[in-house]
Amino acid sequence: MKRMKRSVSLIGLICLAGFLALAGCAHHGQKTLTGSVEETQILLNFLENERDYFHKGGSFVIGAPDLRTNLLTKPQAQYVIDIRSPGDFAKGHIRGAKNVAFADVYNHVKQINAQSYERIVVVDYSGQASAYAVSLLRAAGYANAISLKWGMSSWAEQFAKDSWLKNLGSARMAAFAQTPSPQKNPKGQLPRLATGKTNAKEILEARLNTLFAEGFRPVMVTDGCVFNAWYCGSSYYVVNYWPTELYQKVGHIPGAVNYTPQETPFKSSTHLLTLSTNGANVLYCFTGQTSSYTSGYLRLLGYDARSLLFGANAMVYDRMKENKVPNTFIPQTEIMNYDFVS
């Protein structure tokens, strides 16, 4: 009998220990949900009501012809930042451009008299990383920041060979669907930010520092990953950022949800809250430039937003040409072959 009581007591202790362990795990699990929606709401209110660069900031790109004209007629009013690697910069760059690593761009701009320039032009290989950088700079209050459309690929063929010309493709034409859009997610909550700040400008500053330090790599995703998400170890909420008529006419990635630009879908009053907060949101446009710019805005708010590299040009290029879709990369008209220095 004593032995039985001892056994029961032992079992009870084991059960109690197990219960406490589970309780401890549950408590630990709650801690992984760091940050708060309130922080995000403070930042969102600021970006929508006081510094709405994303919806009201105008075009974020400048074409090579306009940049060249500005450099010839008013060179002192242009400040060009080239974020390509030092090695590629040395092989050729726009005269007067400063070579700055992506992670250092924000601090670099802080150290110049930014408001004395008409334009702060950010340049990269293809216009995608530069569009992302410009989105962050405009959020910081540098409304004169702008991205060179198509990057150095538009300046001379030498640069396009290893960038845009190398990434045009039509391999996904047969896989593209021409069905109506699936429904958007039901509206949920904002992501949680954990800067520890309570003031909008301080929260924004913390987010800017984090995103510039991370660089563009976490934003990039290829069509190979989107079509074979299992291979990349991810599941994606795919956002097609096109007008509805082109969503069906040109076709779309199967399962992609149409967020038409005309609806300003990334406002809190429209469809912002339908984006996923549990996984990655992959945005794609025609070129990868608008989706990169948009990803900058969404990542500031804590969304895991990613941009599909080179957009539809990398997937259904021939169909884009056939349908004369805007922002199709046409080498004969988009590559200017301007002079450069090395």
Question: PLM features: what roles do these ranges have?
Answer:
Residues L67, Y79-R84, A97-V100, Y237-N240, ...:
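Short hydrophobic beta-strand that contains or immediately precedes a catalytic carboxylate
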